[in-house]
Amino acid sequence: MIISLFVPFLAFSLLASAAANEFDIQSNYAKTEYKIAMRDGVKLYAAVYAPRGYTATLPILLTRTPYSASPYGPENYPKHLGPLGFAEEKFIFVVEDVRGRFMSEGDFVDVRPIKDVLDGPKDVDESTDTYDTIDWLVKNVPGNNGKVGIIGTSYGGYYATSALIRSHPALVAASPQAPMADLYRGDDAYHNGAFFLVANFSFYTGFVKQKNPVSTSEAPPFDYGTDDAYKFYLAMGPLADSDRLYLLNRNPYWTDMYRHTTEDSFWKVRNLLPHIKNVTPAVLVVGGWYDAEDLSGTLKTYQAIRRQSPTTVCRLIMGPWSHGGWNYGKGDKLGDIAFGNDTAEVLRDSEIHFFKQYLKDAPPVDQPPAFMFETGANEWKISEQWPPARTPQKLYLRAGGKLSFKSPAQEPDFDEYVSDPANPVPYMPHSPQDMVKEYMTADQHFVSNRKDVISYSTEPLTEDLTIAGPISPNLFVSTSGSDSDFDVKLIDAYPTDSQDPLAGYQQLVRGEPFRGKFRNSFTKPEAFTPGKVEEIRFDMPDVYHCFKKGHRIMLQVQSSWFPLTDRNPQTFTDIPNAKPSDFVPATEKIYHSSRTPSSIEFGVEPTALPNHETVTSR
């Protein structure tokens, strides 16, 4: 059943956002600053903003951040409180510097591990700090109604998720948005063993250890000496040289990121997912299909709650957004790809209703468990679960660059290319120093003439085909080296003979690297035997994408994606400490015979499903 969202439905959100841009915080809110003592005596800075002249009790909406609760000082006010439109709804807003950051005392630990069992009454982690903060707020902030919500994006989303663990009874609603969850398995640091280089280096040049309390960042702007990231990182050499040449061994957070190349205890204790159980607050998880940092964490947080705390009210909203993009834009496009409407407005309306229902006892609004934007079709859809019911399908890599639903029979056995670490495949035609978020939808034509990228394509589709959920490449490969990466990109190839301005566009739908030495274990890497055929299988993050009639489904396979990921020297070694002589060309072979049927597996959404409805926003 198709349900149209008429213009009046969005009018409230559009007006709310317009009003938010004009809403004066200082005229409408009174600010008070506090130092809140934790159970171990460490005091955390919190700024409390309460509506002026409001006599009724109000709920508290908390945000915890490592990025500064500024502006500091009782007379200094931010431009916004909470998401757009929230300030007009009258909450008591609290913004807190987490332990060891900016104006809070204590030692900061990057992604501080959560403990299932505390060592004593003064033992702390992010869960206890949130509990102690909430306990103090409800007992000491005037005019609160005893109900607390928490909201945060990215690192703030991680803190919002942490609040769900051994949560305070007053915490009744939480919205982790683009939350980190497992840094090694697909979030900010590593994807299938490959290090996300440009995102982490640019982040940790500014995110440094502080001598707190401090009101401003102590990191001066980093001088790259060039605006060409490809050139800069190629000249950097092995990652261990980054400390010596650029950061002078002064940032332990960066060093920890690149040195722990396997899924060792450093990463395992920082994996939040096993701890998210027995959740009592209602949860609204929010994420973007084009989140280059924490798409994996968003989906896994939702799935962990549904699996490990099945009675918890847990909703998921996924839109066509980059990392946190719903917070600062309309959500109408990303790069060259337009989505047909201002998608972020739909989210803001849902957010407000969610918190008003649980914090202010507002009448419940009929909102689905999963509210998902289908890219390609540019439609919002609602479902009882994510992923929805779907039919498994495989596309097989075939000779001649073909991609087919039919498995190979007798045909040439493999395709091959030479991967050279001295000339890695770029992830964008030109890459500035910060990671380019638009790479998630970018046209892949710019690598079509490279001999180290192999493309496979279906015939034009005779009807629309929607892929929903995770994608699983299953490749049979060999290498002349002792280690190699195998990066897979799923692409929507637009017709070349249409009048569409994007005619011939090869839109990236999902891409993911895989470091070959981890094909059997992320804790015990294994060298390749040169020339030996090996099977590599891995999961790529979920998509919800409609390949339209007349489009082609394309797959590209390559062995570098630079400087999005660090270079694999193609010699089995500890990559951060690789020597220049370890970086060698390697011949990579992708096999597609009846004995070695390389393929990509995914779920196809049926055209009509019970409990699955299409919502067209106008």
Spans of features found by a protein language model:
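N-terminal cap/lid segment of alpha/beta-hydrolase-fold proteins
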Residues: 21-56, 457-463, 528
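Cap/lid segment of the alpha/beta-hydrolase catalytic domain
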Residues: 52-140, 189, 327-339, 450, ...
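Accessory cap/linker subdomain of secreted extracellular hydrolases
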Residues: 80, 88, 110-123, 127, ...
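Alpha/beta-hydrolase fold nucleophile elbow
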Residues: 142-154
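Glycine-rich nucleophile elbow surrounding the catalytic serine of serine-hydrolase chemistry
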Residues: 152-162
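C-terminal, loop-rich substrate-recognition/catalytic regions characterized by aromatic stacking residues
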Residues: 224-226, 231-239, 326, 332-618
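Short beta-strand/loop motif that positions the catalytic acidic residue
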Residues: 279, 285-287
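Conserved alpha/beta-hydrolase "acid-adjacent" motif
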Residues: 292-299
